[in-house]
Regions:
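Catalytic cores of Mg2+-dependent Asp-rich isoprenoid enzymes
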Residues: 1-209, 215, 220-337
Length: 337
């Protein structure tokens, strides 16, 4: 039962792909120093990344108003690249740490410049320049992105979490909760709620989404010598299963998937009635995201004997969209909007 060793994590873009594509995207900005056009270029860069790396999130974000959609795409680029550095780049641990440190220094340095064009002319990447512009416009505190990069650094050296609270407070906060916070600023709060209430809702949803991703990726993570299931969790025989996952034991991997998905289910339920905290024009996309990933999580729970990576079909994804939005979504996908 050790054939999982042969399974390879899917590599979407190599490090060179990232560098080449970034060079071309950056060149477009430098050719035309117009603020509005530069935001569009930064957003298009983010859209290319989002479409390539997450078809599910790409689909639900088509339901956002144009301005918010553009800003979400920029945010996605800023969180996807560091994640790929850690998980996909063929580099030593120290080389990955150095890239993340340089990325953090770029982010801090970017505060010194007025706009995207000026940042690019001072050796700031388009990924960071676009994200800094979003942070400036929405007044997103720098500490959240620093926390995100710190969480990415933790993934370079596998960490052990003693219980759910330890995992949520000391890893998921940086890797997912703060991303939910970024989106809260962009989505905005309704007249009857506050930014703080939106952030609490985003926190619960971010935890749920991250736990679902952990559940789906247990097999791939075990190849990397990584296990996010807390050390205190036990299987139906009351046996600790953490070491079994690290050692690629199929039964323990399946048990881990189910425990993670069950914990995720609790967090989906916690935020399901609080999506109205957000502005009306953002709710459809947020509800679609909640429904889509809940469906994926339930699929993991139902396929109790499957240790492979679950996914939703195109039909399953489209089925979560209200029928009166089919045309809008179809046009957006066909026209690559």
């Amino acid at each position: 039962m050790d054939y999982i060793n042969k399974e390879k994590a899917k590599l979407v873009w190599t490090q060179k792909d990232w560098e080449d594509k970034h060079f071309e995207a950056k060149k477009k900005v430098l050719e035309y120093p117009n603020y509005s056009a530069n935001i569009d270029h930064a957003s298009n860069w983010g859209k290319a990344i989002l479409k390539k790396f997450s078809s599910s999130f790409f689909t639900v974000t088509r339901l956002l108003p144009e301005k918010k959609k553009k800003d979400v795409q920029i945010i996605y680029a800023a969180v996807r690249y560091p994640d790929e550095v850690v998980d996909s780049f063929n580099l030593s641990k120290s080389e990955k740490v150095q890239i993340l440190k340089r990325f953090e220094l770029e982010f801090v340095k970017s505060k010194n410049y007025k706009n995207i064009y000026e940042m690019l002319n001072n050796n700031i990447s388009l990924t960071i320049a676009g994200f800094r512009d979003v942070c400036n416009r929405y007044k997103i505190p720098d500490k959240y992105y620093i926390a995100f990069l710190d969480a990415m650094k933790k993934d370079i050296e596998s960490s052990v979490y003693k219980d759910w609270k330890d995992l949520i407070d000391n890893y998921i906060f940086g890797s997912a909760t703060v991303v939910g916070y970024f989106l809260s600023y962009v989505y905005g709060h309704s007249k009857n709620s506050s930014l703080g209430e939106c952030m609490e809702t985003s926190k619960s949803l971010a935890i749920a989404l991250q736990l679902t991703n952990f559940a789906r990726d247990v097999s791939e993570d075990s190849i990397r010598g990584r296990c996010y299931l807390p050390k205190d969790q036990k299987d139906h025989k009351n046996q600790i299963i953490y070491n079994g996952v690290i050692n690629k034991n199929i039964d323990d991997i399946i048990s881990s998937k189910l425990l993670l998905a069950n914990e995720a289910k609790r967090w989906y339920e916690k935020c399901s009635n609080r999506i109205d905290n957000f502005t009306e024009d953002s709710r459809l996309a947020i509800k679609a995201c909640h429904t889509l990933y809940s469906k994926l999580n339930n699929k993991i729970l139902k396929q109790e004997n499957n240790f492979q990576r679950e996914s939703l079909s195109v039909v399953e994804k489209i089925s979560i969209i209200p029928k009166n939005q089919y045309l809008k979504l179809a046009i957006a996908l066909v026209m690559n909007k």
